Amino acid sequence: MSTWPAPSTATPVHATVTVPGSKSQTNRALVLAALAVPQGSSTISGALRSRDTDLMISALQGLGVVVEAPDTDGSDGTELTVSGALAPKAGARIDCGLAGTVLRFVPPVAALTTETVTFDGDEQARARPIAPLLDGLRALGVAIDGDGLPFSVRGQGSVRGGTVEIDASGSSQFVSGLLLSGAAFTEGLTVVHTGGAVPSAPHIAMTVSMLRDAGVEVDDSAADRWRVAPGPIAARHWAVEPDLSNAVPFLAAAVISGGTVRVTGWPTVSTQPAATILSLLTSLGSEVRQGNSHLEVQGATSYDGIDVDLRDVGELAPSVAAMAALASPGSVSRLRGIAHLRGHETDRLAALSAELNRLGGQCEETDDGLVITARQMHGGVWRSYADHRMATAGAIVGLRVPGVEVEDIGTTAKTLPDFPQLWADMLAGQTDLQAGAPHAGRNQGR
């Protein structure tokens, strides 16, 4: 497999970056728009166009929904219109790829159709947890063949709904996937979580917020219990925020180089973990300045390790681990609350430990996280495991460690198209970099 020579710099990085739309918001908006088609057409502005979101678009099109990107305004396909009807053709098949949102959000939608819909995905996706969602749907009266990919949902035109108990300790997406479709169920839906702490809980809060924006009545007043009242989901316009988790690798460049990086379009109020990101960057010794529509981070000349619980923001763990490995030599970082990362695109805890140690770092796995001791590292191959966040973590390490070769950098297209070009532009000192905008050689059909 080909490798990408990660650019290095011995000088502070100074750049302004615009990251594309939030994957989490884009795919939730697409699902809600598809469920709202009986009420009319919806529009989405600022949508992310990446492998994950294109898989969601294809999945909904496979269910008969019309998703169009007129691209008459130079938006590069980020302005979408959703219309049509939930009416899949006989024998419909959905490719989930490696997208957890497609795997967990679309089966409840398919259950509302009158056809049997088969789901499959990448080989690695077959190892991702899905049983709690399928068991929950069965408890609600949905007929499903199979207990993991590939599986088939036998739609009967409606879902009874009611109360269902699930263990969502493996993924908050089990809860979100059910809630998104719950208002379309005959009796509505009550989801009760019965297991250990739910990881990435802010993503459930995002789901609840967007449901309310679509006119759905949601009661989340009791811990580990969510009630969605039956009723129409409104067709409306959705404005997608920039993806703040995708901004973190660029902000990390400021942290580890002592430079200054500004991200434009940073929301003042957000359902994404904006406050947590600011707290993390501050704990790493950086100065954080937030304006009306931007965030600017100025890194310190050096910084120490941190002790942090990342349960709610596990997607940031690879970037945080990379920054921890590059802290002041001898300083120790403890990343806690992320045992669930063993069930993501890859076992991220094992992968991070293996790759940091391969390049001379010191990283040990614990029951629920990592202990990283910063030490001098050397170049070598950084394996990405077909995981977009592992690939960007390798780029962060390579910024300070010459000779790092990142395997399969193309996997970053899962959520951040054109990452290699954007990274190079940032290091070249260019400003107003537009993530997701056309570059020479970009595959426009992605």
Swiss-Prot record:
EC number(s) reported in the record: 2.5.1.19
Main localization, broad class: cytoplasm
Subcellular location: Cytoplasm
Keywords on record: Amino-acid biosynthesis, Aromatic amino acid biosynthesis, Cytoplasm, Transferase
EC category name: transferase
MF GO annotations: 3-phosphoshikimate 1-carboxyvinyltransferase activity
Pathway involvement of the protein, from the record: Metabolic intermediate biosynthesis; chorismate biosynthesis; chorismate from D-erythrose 4-phosphate and phosphoenolpyruvate: step 6/7
InterPro entries, per the entry: Enolpyruvate_Tfrase_dom, Enolpyruvate_Tfrase_sf, EPSP_synthase, EPSP_synthase_CS, RNA3'P_cycl/enolpyr_Trfase_a/b
Position of the signal peptide: none
GO CC annotations on file: cytoplasm
Binding of 3-phosphoshikimate, residues: K23, S24, R28, S171, S172, Q173, S200, E315, H344
Residue segments, region Disordered: 1-20
Pfam family, one: EPSP_synthase
Reactions listed under catalytic activity: 3-phosphoshikimate + phosphoenolpyruvate = 5-O-(1-carboxyvinyl)-3-phosphoshikimate + phosphate
GO biological process terms held by the UniProt record: amino acid biosynthetic process; aromatic amino acid family biosynthetic process; chorismate biosynthetic process
Active site: E315 (proton acceptor)
Subunit structure: Monomer.
Family annotation (PANTHER family): AROM/DEHYDROQUINATE SYNTHASE (PTHR21090), PENTAFUNCTIONAL AROM POLYPEPTIDE (PTHR21090:SF5)
Task of the protein: Catalyzes the transfer of the enolpyruvyl moiety of phosphoenolpyruvate (PEP) to the 5-hydroxyl of shikimate-3-phosphate (S3P) to produce enolpyruvyl shikimate-3-phosphate and inorganic phosphate.
Record's protein name: 3-phosphoshikimate 1-carboxyvinyltransferase
Annotated source species: Mycolicibacterium vanbaalenii (strain DSM 7251 / JCM 13017 / BCRC 16820 / KCTC 9966 / NRRL B-24157 / PYR-1)
